[in-house]
């Protein structure tokens, strides 16, 4: 309850900061480049739409690195077919120890898309493999089944522009059930008819919205 009360002040501060959006848009040339890391394990059902939506984010300079963490389904093959991936030789510094990497791919359709194929080691190990291959100083971790708003990268980078001491930032997680989604983007938010899912939405609001804002 105390966190919920404290979070109200953070929400008010956040709403006031949103008025700066138009001002910040004029400084798109100063946006720090970002590497988006997408660890994927058996994500054949959603990987194509998720990657496509990430490639369409409204941001000046970013790369998308999908890390196939030893998937046993068709995750890698779907990526190869959909985005015309071709294997490439890569020499990079192993800054973080990871499970063996089997290969690197680049897309013939999207120059800012790369895929790492490695042995299974878990989400943290997959992220470490992605960090080893990043080209930019900042990285953003995104689950392979997540749906982002087009301006989400601009918003999560805003704290870095406002305060150079910022080392990490995060967003709010919500449940997409009952909402209208097209081509990997949220068109209209809605509520599901299932009561249990509605209860889960309330729990997500408590944990990820009020909880995080309260602690911040």
Which residue stretches match the model-derived regions?
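Short, acidic, metal-binding catalytic loop of nucleotide-sugar glycosyltransferases
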Residues: 52-61, 82-89
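Short, well-formed alpha-helical segments that are part of the catalytic scaffolds
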Residues: 17-21, 43-56, 77, 125
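A conserved acidic beta->alpha catalytic loop
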Residues: 68-88
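The conserved acidic donor/metal-binding loop of glycosyltransferases
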Residues: 143-147
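N-terminal membrane-anchoring/stem segments of glycan-assembly enzymes
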Residues: 1-30, 212
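Cell-envelope/extracellular polymer assembly enzymes that use nucleotide-activated donors
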Residues: 32-35, 63
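Long helical/loop segments within the catalytic core of UDP-sugar-dependent glycosyltransferases
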Residues: 6, 88-128, 132, 150-151, ...
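Short aromatic/hydrophobic "clamp" motif used to bind/position activated sugar donors
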Residues: 139
